[in-house]
Amino acid sequence: RSTFEITSFAQKIQPNNELEPIMRHGEHPRILQFRNTEEEIQSLADLVSSFKSSHYTSLGIICKTESQAKELAQKLQPYTDCISLLSNQSSTYIKGIIITSAHMAKGLEFDEVIIPQADDKNYHSSTDKSMLYVAVTRAMHKLTLTYSSPLRICRFL
């Protein structure tokens, strides 16, 4: 279901012999670095805006934890009102733009995925590596990872 480029990117994080790439090509995954958290949040709002003017119908903003997803949903609120938080308390799944955790995203797929805070402080353990892999493999067509200085990009990328 994911493009060849996204599948290849996922294999670098955590090799999986059962993950067979389909021969559908697309954009290479992007890793965007920002000077600070505020700049990263503004860029996430810009990425959401770009998504809304694209032909894609589903966007997953996948955080490592549910608390990070809730915090990010609040920070993005001033920029857009069309984002839904998918959490343990959610009773329904709403299509469109979803912010959720990697755990809650398991089994879902999105046309486009954004993974914020993809830094070495946030993703450093073997469990984190698995969560990152799950988040990356939710993307079917477009994948963007973001992080802020002074932190470094996560060691698994």
Specify the residue positions occupied by each region the protein language model found.
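Short acidic-hydrophobic, aromatic-tinged amphipathic segments that line or gate anion-handling sites
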Residues: 30-40
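Core RecA-like ATPase module of SF1/SF2 helicases and allied nucleic-acid translocases
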Residues: 1-4, 17, 38, 42, ...
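Conserved RecA-like helicase ATPase core segment
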Residues: 1-32, 156-157
